[in-house]
């Protein structure tokens, strides 16, 4: 009977293992992608690529993942939730500036072959007088990439120039740059003069420049007579479900901090824009300044998804979307669309991922933000981090190729 007992135990044990395997087999198909994403993001957090993240992935009409990971900072105090906001950095260039231009192109016949000096007469007497919308949007204008205006707000001894910027708000110094810095709004004239005088080199060649995007809020106001932010809210953001997209969020507790800035603002940048040039516009700019959650970006980019297209519910025409999101200069190795980023043209080492089609498009942001849409497989993905916390020196997000690995997981899932 001892023998029978042992056999019985072995049989029961084997049966249990079998049943566990059968039931796991079924869930593993559903949870495989979740499991892989969880382990990629959690291991990235433990390697300190970023303290936390949000991931939103949709195929066709099905949301595969809408999840938050980790914490606002490495001290693990505030957990990231789905309704928390990230500083989207250069995603602003497409999710605010470019979609506004797409609408102006439709509603006000904005001609992309026109020189931008048509709308900004101050550029007529400059080296930028012939630069067209097509050139600035495809980053082939030859304009200087970026100007560090904030370096010029300091004296040689490192102190701030009190004629321009102060630590207390007053009637003259009323533009809020950060918690403790207030700028004279008249300084904007200087900023635009500096952009006007900046160099132009090799137009026609690819060089990413953010400078034109500072003109977009002014352009929107000129053409629509509405403030940039109001136009975006009325035209796009207010139509979105669980919308959290906007500039200068009022409730900091839901906002993920970015960098400990020890050069210019001397504080942890939290709730105000990380990009220094955008901060000089009070965070309302065309190059950066938008905050939002991955799920609200997921909702917004539905307007750019050309599959299952129903013209009654869409804010942009299919032809407009195609025009802005296809390669702007097809017979070259330049990879940009108009405003949008696109995959590099070589297939082997294709950036941001080898599986993406030529029709796909998206954008990245300096703070560690990313979205990409591929109409060929009906994929939209949003991946937000604050990799610049506590310092922009942290390049692990790029070195460990985390965005591409995330896309690999999605495409593997599609193949299965």
Residue ranges and their predicted role:
Residues 41, 55, 61, 93, ...:
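Residue-level preference for non-acidic, small/hydrophobic
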Residues 30-88, 109-111, 193, 250, ...:
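Short, conserved catalytic-motif segment at the N-terminal edge
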Residues 363-416:
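Structured C-terminal helix/loop/strand segments within mature extracytoplasmic catalytic/sensor domains
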Residues 1-29:
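Bacterial Sec-dependent N-terminal signal peptides
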Residues 43-54, 76-136, 199-212, 285-288:
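Short active-site loop at a secondary-structure junction
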Residues 54-56, 135-137, 246, 371-372, ...:
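Structural recognition of the beta-strand scaffold that forms the well-ordered cores
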Residues 128-358:
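Short, surface-exposed loop or secondary-structure junction motifs
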Residues 42-44, 85, 326, 355-361, ...:
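Short, P/G- and charge-enriched loop/turn segments at secondary-structure junctions
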């Amino acid at each position: 009977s001892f023998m029978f007992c042992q056999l019985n135990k072995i049989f029961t044990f084997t049966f249990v293992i079998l049943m566990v395997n059968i039931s796991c087999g079924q869930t593993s198909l559903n949870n495989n992608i979740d499991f892989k994403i969880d382990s990629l993001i959690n291991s990235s957090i433990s390697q300190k690529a970023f303290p936390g993240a949000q991931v939103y992935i949709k195929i066709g009409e099905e949301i595969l993942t809408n999840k938050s990971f980790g914490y606002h900072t490495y001290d693990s105090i505030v957990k990231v939730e789905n309704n928390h906001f990230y500083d989207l950095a250069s995603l602003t260039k497409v999710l605010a500036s470019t979609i506004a231009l797409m609408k102006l192109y439709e509603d006000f016949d904005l001609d992309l072959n026109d020189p931008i000096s048509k709308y900004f007469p101050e550029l007529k007497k400059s080296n930028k007088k012939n630069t067209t919308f097509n050139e600035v949007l495809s980053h082939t204008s030859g304009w200087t990439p970026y100007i560090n205006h904030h370096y010029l707000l300091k004296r040689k001894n490192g102190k701030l120039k009190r004629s321009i910027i102060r630590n207390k708000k007053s009637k003259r110094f009323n533009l809020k740059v950060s918690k403790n810095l207030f700028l004279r709004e008249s300084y904007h004239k200087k900023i635009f003069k500096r952009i006007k005088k900046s160099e132009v080199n090799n137009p026609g060649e690819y060089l990413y420049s953010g400078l034109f995007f500072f003109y977009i809020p002014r352009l929107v106001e000129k053409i629509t007579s509405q403030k940039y932010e109001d136009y975006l809210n009325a035209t796009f953001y207010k139509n979105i479900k669980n919308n959290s997209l906007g500039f200068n969020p009022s409730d900091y507790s839901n906002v993920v901090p970015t960098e400990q800035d020890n050069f210019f603002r001397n504080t942890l940048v939290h709730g105000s824009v990380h990009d220094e040039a955008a901060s000089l516009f009070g965070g309302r700019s065309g190059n950066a300044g938008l905050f939002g959650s991955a799920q609200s970006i997921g909702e917004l980019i539905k307007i750019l998804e050309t599959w299952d297209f129903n013209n009654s519910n869409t804010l942009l025409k299919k032809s407009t979307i195609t025009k802005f999101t296809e390669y702007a200069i097809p017979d070259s190795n330049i990879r940009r669309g108009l405003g949008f980023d696109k995959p590099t043209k070589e297939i082997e080492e294709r950036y941001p991922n080898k599986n993406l089609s030529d029709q796909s498009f998206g954008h990245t942001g300096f703070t560690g933000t990313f979205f990409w849409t591929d109409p060929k497989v009906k994929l939209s993905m949003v991946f937000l981090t604050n990799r610049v916390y506590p310092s922009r020196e942290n390049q692990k997000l790029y070195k460990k190729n985390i965005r591409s690995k995330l896309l690999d997981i999605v495409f593997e899932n599609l193949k299965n």
